[in-house]
């Protein structure tokens, strides 16, 4: 299934019910006063975050969402029934924006968090409300107030601790499938990962966990929409840490440094804040002879730039425990610093 992480929808809250024109009519009261009730309130349109949804696919194909109108007022001063709210479930991590202005209306990051995107109209007043000393039998009532309407844009950003980045086919999907229960489609060609994947990783004594997000491989020009484009970069904006995987086995001359620079250039072009995120850099496919032959030079080149490389093999599992431990410790330090600043 294609992953849908954006949707534009029209929402219309319910109109308020019409006020009632009515007069008291009883056997011995031929000229009773006005007793028309007020109209009921129209239903609100409410966006609700829920973990039971993980895509915006449904909203991509159902764009119009209209709440019910309030009931009309009735005689005997009976108020019309208020309409129920229309709730629209979205995945946790959804950003709600006004489609026209781009204004961020809500950032729904917790289960059950909700935001009213369109308020229902108030019911019109019945004729009983308009009776005065000089007009004891008003023959008019108010119409209900129309409900709010607007176009909104929804944008989903996956919530994960660690975002895995790298060029296509460096082994990100193989890595996440080995270390977590996630099972992304894996094949030996670029752009196998067509959708982001989340995986929960347990390490050490299995009491420590973190969440990985595997996104499609980036290529030069990704921030301008080349390849899979920038639509997936937003999913790593909320991560605390980036795991940058490189592959030096694809040709005889590659040391991984050029690839490393390409990816970081794309991150910087997309968001200056993204490039400032801490990165752990790891070189995959140490099970291949060509990688083992070139590994020493690659380690030296990165070390000269002040970067420690973590070699591993997603195919055999070699080096993965040490890499997971390093990621876990880095996350603990980041969270500790965040707690200190709160």
Swiss-Prot record:
Residues 1-159 form the Obg domain. Mg(2+) binds at residues 173, 193. GO terms for cellular component: cytoplasm. GO terms for molecular function: GTP binding; GTPase activity; magnesium ion binding. GTP binds at residues 166-173, 191-195, 214-217, 284-287, 313-315. GO terms for biological process: ribosome biogenesis. It holds the Pfam family GTP1_OBG. The keyword GTP-binding applies. It is found in: Cytoplasm. Its cofactor is Mg(2+). Its main location: cytoplasm. Its EC number is 3.6.5.-. Residues 160-332 form the OBG-type G domain. Keywords: Cytoplasm, GTP-binding, Hydrolase, Magnesium, Metal-binding, Nucleotide-binding. An essential GTPase which binds GTP, GDP and possibly (p)ppGpp with moderate affinity, with high nucleotide exchange rates and a fairly low GTP hydrolysis rate. Plays a role in control of the cell cycle, stress response, ribosome biogenesis and in those bacteria that undergo differentiation, in morphogenesis control. Belongs to the TRAFAC class OBG-HflX-like GTPase superfamily. OBG GTPase family. NCBIfam families: Obg_CgtA (TIGR02729), PRK12296.1 (NF008954), PRK12297.1 (NF008955), PRK12299.1 (NF008956). Monomer. This is GTPase Obg. It comes from Syntrophus aciditrophicus (strain SB). The lineage of its organism: Bacteria, Pseudomonadati, Thermodesulfobacteriota, Syntrophia, Syntrophales.
